[in-house]
Amino acid sequence: MLEGVIRESITKANAKALKKDGYLIANVYGKGIENVNCAFKLNPFIKYLKEKKHLIFPVKLGDKTFEVVVQEYQKNPVTNELIHVDLLAVTKGVKSKFKVPVKHQGTPVGLKNKGILMLSKKRISVECAPEHLPDHYLVDVAPLDVNESVLVRDLEKHENVKILDHDSIAVIGVIKAK
C-alpha cells in the first residue's frame, strides 16, 4: 500500500521543497470527503502504478486509508517527469466517471499488407460504480486488415458499465503506409 504525507501548508515554497526532496504533489478528492492535499515519494509511486493490477488501489494518508483511482496527472513537457497527480477517492455503490485503458492482443493481418497499426483511443470514458469497473478493454486486432478498425460499439459490454464515448469513434485500426 502506498503511504503519503498530508501537506499542512499548500504554498508554492512548500511544494518546491517537497519536490526537491523527491516527493510528488497530489490531491485526493471525492464525493462526500474533504479534499486532502498530500505528497508521495515519487519513485515508489511510479513503481507501484506500473506494478498494480487494478485501476483502483489503496493509499494511506495519516491515519486514514482511501481507495483511489488516478483521475488526472501532469508531466513536465521537457523532462517528461511526473509533477502532479489527482486521485479520485471512490465509494462502493456510488457511480463515478472513469477512464479505462485499452489493450490489444495479436498481430493484425494488415501488417503483412503494408499497413500500420494505429491506436486512436488509449482510454475509454465510462460511468459506473467502482465494484463494476473493468481493469481494461482488451481488443483482438488479429483479424484487422488495411483500412479496417474497431469502433467503440465493437468493444465488449460489461454489466452495469455505461460507455460515455460516442459509438462511432475508432479505438484501434490498421491504416495504409504511405
Swiss-Prot record:
GO biological process: translation
Classification via InterPro entries: Rbsml_bL25/Gln-tRNA_synth_N (IPR020056), Ribosomal_bL25/Gln-tRNA_synth (IPR011035), Ribosomal_bL25_b-dom (IPR020057), Ribosomal_bL25_C (IPR037121), Ribosomal_bL25_long (IPR001021), Ribosomal_L25_dom (IPR029751), Ribosomal_uL5_bac-type (IPR020930)
GO cellular component: cytosolic large ribosomal subunit
Pfam families linked to this entry: Ribosomal_L25p, Ribosomal_TL5_C
GO molecular function, one term: 5S rRNA binding
Keyword Ribonucleoprotein attached: yes
This protein's UniProt keywords: Ribonucleoprotein, Ribosomal protein, RNA-binding, rRNA-binding
Signal sequence region: none
Family: Belongs to the bacterial ribosomal protein bL25 family. CTC subfamily.
Protein's job: This is one of the proteins that binds to the 5S RNA in the ribosome where it forms part of the central protuberance.
Xref: NCBIfam families: bL25_bact_ctc (TIGR00731), PRK05618.1-4 (NF004129)
Subunit structure: Part of the 50S ribosomal subunit; part of the 5S rRNA/L5/L18/L25 subcomplex. Contacts the 5S rRNA. Binds to the 5S rRNA independently of L5 and L18.
Protein name: Large ribosomal subunit protein bL25
Taxonomic placement: Bacteria, Pseudomonadati, Campylobacterota, Epsilonproteobacteria, Campylobacterales
